[in-house]
């Protein structure tokens, strides 16, 4: 009887291990809650302003970049994108790339 219980527990444990090893999970974090959402509501000069600049350009602001082949009959509701918003995003990406390179250099040299 004791041996049969041990074998049953071993089989159950192996099944559980097999199931756990085949399961994968994905955790999704949204920035719309918590401390960051409250801090991001102000004007910080970050990505939020670039996005709002894109949103305000839908009416056809001067200096906007119009995608090729776009017309009123194409069904696109995006509108022109201001060059200043594109340049702001470019500068953000470039600055982060410089920071990453500096961190890598410090890690390898340190």
UniProtKB/Swiss-Prot annotation:
The keyword Secreted applies. Its main location: secreted. One of its GO terms (molecular function) is hormone activity. One of its GO terms (cellular component) is extracellular region. Keywords: Amidation, Cleavage on pair of basic residues, Hormone, Pigment, Pyrrolidone carboxylic acid, Secreted, Signal. Pfam families: Adipokin_hormo. InterPro entries: Adipokinetic_hormone_CS, AKH/RPCH_hormone. The modification Tryptophan amide is found at residue 33. Residues 1-25 form the signal peptide. The modification Pyrrolidone carboxylic acid is found at residue 26. It is found in: Secreted. This hormone adapts the animal to light backgrounds by stimulating concentration of the pigment of its red body-chromatophores. Belongs to the AKH/HRTH/RPCH family. This is Red pigment-concentrating prohormone. It comes from Carcinus maenas (Common shore crab).
């Amino acid at each position: 009887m004791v041996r049969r219980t041990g074998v049953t527990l071993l089989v159950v444990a192996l099944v559980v291990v097999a199931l756990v090893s085949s399961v994968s999970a994905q955790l999704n974090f949204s920035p719309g809650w918590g401390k960051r959402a409250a801090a991001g509501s102000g004007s910080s000069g970050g990505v939020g302003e670039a996005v709002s600049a894109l949103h305000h350009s839908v009416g056809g602001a001067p200096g906007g970049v119009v995608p090729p082949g776009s017309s009123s009959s194409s069904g696109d509701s995006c509108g022109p994108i201001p060059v200043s918003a594109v340049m702001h995003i470019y500068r953000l990406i470039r600055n982060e790339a410089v920071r990453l390179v500096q961190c890598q250099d410090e890690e390898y040299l340190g």
